[in-house]
Amino acid sequence: MGNLFKFSLNCIKYRSENLEKSKMFYQYFYFHLTLSIVLIYGSDIGKDANEHMSSVPKKIIIEGTRQKRQVVTKLFSPQWSNAKVFYCNADSFSKLQLKKLKLKKNSDTVKRKLMKFAMNFISSQTCVTFEENCTISTRIKFVDSTFCASYVGMINSVQEIYFPDWCMRFGSAVHELMHALGVLHTHARFDRDNFLNVNLNKDDEDDSNFEIVSPPFSINVVPYEYGSTLHYTADVSGTNSLLPKQMEYYRTLGNRRVTFYDMLTINTAYNCKCPSELLCANGGYTNPSNCLECICPLGYGGVLCDRVVACSVQLSADSYWKGSWISVGSSVLRDTTDPVKAFISINAPKDKIIEVKIVKIENFSCDSGCNNNGVEIKYMGDPRITNPIICCENQVDPSNKGYKAKLNPLLINIYTFLGKNKVTFHYRYVNERLSSYNKTTNGYDNYEYYA
């Protein structure tokens, strides 16, 4: 995968406290991170674009603007032949237009580098490839604009992806590329009313961004995922406009991390497969871009996804509550294509259920989508699905009973784009057998996990 600029060496400061025995100890974990850096600016999709609607072609998804029935109503069609996408950059698609942002060297190509990074990411996990070609008749043209928009699927001519300064986020770039590959918004699924209560303001009632696309014009190939990069925020059309029926997901909607199921959607759509399949663990599957390794759910690593990521903090639970805190990031603001991440792996004896609760979060930016920072406790049985993300103090209730995990070990993911964040949490295992729960599947494949 192509990289832009690199930095390394981050320190995670971690403290653990045995709450029953009042014994404290400190550990410092240094791990090596290599991140690709690009300027990230702006806000969630959906700002200041209505005045430009008259110049927008039909059959295109315009993020956060009112459009009446202009969307191509097929989830995976038309597709790009041989999963090969041609693209070209408009001359203007390079430099950020916002003069108030003082960028250092290479700022004149920052948009192109972000989009190239997003294309490389997709190619690294799918059979889809991208090739720059400014003469072929069927191609994507990246265009600077004041609105963020893309056609859905391949349209057999030059098709624009409009990408303004305020859309400058890695997940937003992948979002628009997925539209160009033929994938609609998550909240356009025909089963969305099982997961959302939709309460649009009057101006948005006829907006095709919120229309359900029903069979035979759409199919579902993965579970409904509140954390998909193709989902809008809960407040995109006013307070509680897309209200999740699982309210703990309220802040997760609109998150622009790219998920395991996002890439699986592309692989299913384009029938990306390897000649032979590896025995991938924890719900992973053989990477069609590199058939010698598996694509792993967040937090898992190794060739076969049979271990947690190498740089995770390892903790051992007991039958009594223990307390820990962890500090992630630094005092320096970093603008990156990928956040600074930390993983905590809480281990317990075999077949024990782990319980964890967040007691306090500090220096977190509270926003719709938790795009600046967040904490995800991977307590659900399916290791591939996005769990509710916490980034606001009102999401934390130290008096609650906590989360009982259907996974052992239990993973906690903390990520940040903004400065140094601190999380305090308690954990233990309870006298309950994990195997006492029934196993289930996600309804789309045969991988079994505890329900």
Swiss-Prot record:
Its main location: secreted. It is found in: Secreted. Residues 70-273 form the Peptidase M12A domain. InterPro entries: MetalloPept_cat_dom_sf, Metallopeptidase_nem, Peptidase_M12A, Peptidase_Metallo. Its EC number is 3.4.24.-. Glycans are attached at N133, N363, N438. Disulfide bonds join C127-C272, C148-C167, C274-C291, C296-C305. Its cofactor is Zn(2+). One of its GO terms (biological process) is molting cycle, collagen and cuticulin-based cuticle. Keywords: Disulfide bond, EGF-like domain, Glycoprotein, Hydrolase, Metal-binding, Metalloprotease, Protease, Secreted, Zinc, Zymogen. It comes from the Eukaryota. The active site is at E176. Binds 1 zinc ion per subunit. SMART domains: ZnMc. Pfam families: Astacin (PF01400). The keyword Secreted applies. Residues 267-306 form the EGF-like domain. Metalloprotease. This is Zinc metalloproteinase nas-16. The lineage of its organism: Eukaryota, Metazoa, Ecdysozoa, Nematoda, Chromadorea.
